[in-house]
Amino acid sequence: MTAIPITRSSIAPERQQLIRQSVRSAAAIMTEADNSRLAQADDAHIFHAFLSDPDIHAPIYTLPRPLNVDAVRAFIADHLAQRERGEGLLFLNFDASGAISGYVDIVIWPQWAAGELGGAVGKARQGQRRGIEGARRGFDWMFDVLGLDLICETAALDNIRTAKLLDGLGFRRRGEILSEREDGTTRPSLVWEVTRSEWDAYHRR
């Protein structure tokens, strides 16, 4: 059983179905400027090329290992199946030239009206306010479009950039867990959470 979210508040089956349907209906995620769409099987080569930069893939424990085109294709197929169940989404973001500028990997726990947003942005966007603004828009979208009550995030203990981002966006630190990769290896991770009401108050929505 997953170690996250830490906070688990069960919701009515009818509301769970509404969340699942919102996930199944999602075709793009709100971004600051880039175009977004669902990842498809024929994106495997370009997505693999984007992920091949160690600075992008190394910190992300949810990516397949070894990281090759076939593994990326299977990763996309798994997320399309998750979407059909109403439990996950994988979006690719594209810049004005049509190149991948980032991706968004969303896990949904409909039974708790909770979710986790992961992914990465290309080097051109790293270290800029655009990355922070993009994360904020993504969290807004999860609350507003998917109808979630809670967002839970994790990061490696030495991932200072993500820690600063989450702290600065109003998330609460909830402790440490042992995250497990698909290949069975593990890493310690810090955990943050924020409820919809906390998010709305912090960002004056």
Give residue spans per PLM region.
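Conserved GNAT-fold acetyl-CoA-binding loop/helix
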Residues: 57-78
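Acyl-donor (CoA/ACP) binding surface of acyl/acetyltransferases
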Residues: 1-55, 93-205
